[in-house]
UniProtKB/Swiss-Prot annotation:
Disulfide bonds join 28-56, 29-79. Residues 1-25 form the signal peptide. Keywords: Disulfide bond, Fusion of virus membrane with host cell membrane, Fusion of virus membrane with host membrane, Glycoprotein, Host cell membrane, Host Golgi apparatus, Host membrane, Membrane, Signal, Viral envelope protein, Viral penetration into host cytoplasm, Virion, Virus entry into host cell. One of its GO terms (cellular component) is host cell Golgi apparatus. The gene is gL. This is Envelope glycoprotein L. InterPro entries: Herpes_gL_rhadinovirus, Herpes_gL_rhadinovirus_sf, HSV_GL_alphagamma. The heterodimer glycoprotein H-glycoprotein L is required for the fusion of viral and plasma membranes leading to virus entry into the host cell. Acts as a functional inhibitor of gH and maintains gH in an inhibited form. Upon binding to host integrins, gL dissociates from gH leading to activation of the viral fusion glycoproteins gB and gH. The heterodimer gH/gL targets also host EPHA2 to promote viral entry. It is found in: Virion membrane; Host cell membrane; Host Golgi apparatus, Host trans-Golgi network. The keyword Cell division does not apply. Residues 23-128 are annotated as: Interaction with gH. Interacts with glycoprotein H (gH); this interaction is necessary for the correct processing and cell surface expression of gH. The heterodimer gH/gL seems to interact with gB trimers during fusion. The heterodimer gH/gL interacts with host EPHA2 to facilitate virus internalization and fusion. It comes from Epstein-Barr virus (strain GD1). Transmembrane segments: none annotated.
Length: 137
């Protein structure tokens, strides 16, 4: 339980919800299906940036970043389905809701708000080819 709290506190402190920042450097990315050797290990993820579905034409996206071992230099960044990332962390936080700090309770509220902002109507209006899922190597 303590490890989950530490992980959430260190990794999720940097969550940014960007509903109106269309000029942020490449907030909309392509989600690719990666082979196992190209996946980021959960314990190596240092930052997770969530992009609102209103920023990327109805798509909820997330950027998962991992630094080079022993440095602050970003070497790996992966694009992910933001709705899945948000759902995963909501599930973890709700399982341990009685032990959450006020900061993590606030994070849970923010994540639930972001999750609630997603609608099928947004996706139906999206250009599905713009951020199409690609099979990667």
């Amino acid at each position: 339980m303590r490890a989950v709290g530490v992980f959430l506190a260190t990794c999720l402190v940097t969550i940014f919800v960007l509903p109106t920042w269309g000029n942020w450097a490449y907030p909309c990315c392509h989600v690719t299906q990666l082979r196992a050797q190209h996946l980021l290990a959960l314990e190596n993820i240092s930052d997770i940036y969530l992009v609102s579905n209103q920023t990327c034409d109805g798509f909820s996206l997330a950027s998962l970043n991992s630094p080079k071992n022993g440095s602050n230099q970003l070497v790996i960044s992966r694009c992910a389905n933001g709705l899945n990332v948000v759902s995963f962390f909501i599930s973890i936080l709700k399982r341990s809701s009685s032990a959450l700090t006020s900061h993590l309770r606030e994070l849970l509220t923010t994540l639930e708000s972001l999750y609630g902002s997603f609608s099928v109507e947004d996706l139906f209006g999206a250009n599905l080819n713009r951020y199409a899922w690609h099979r990667g190597g």
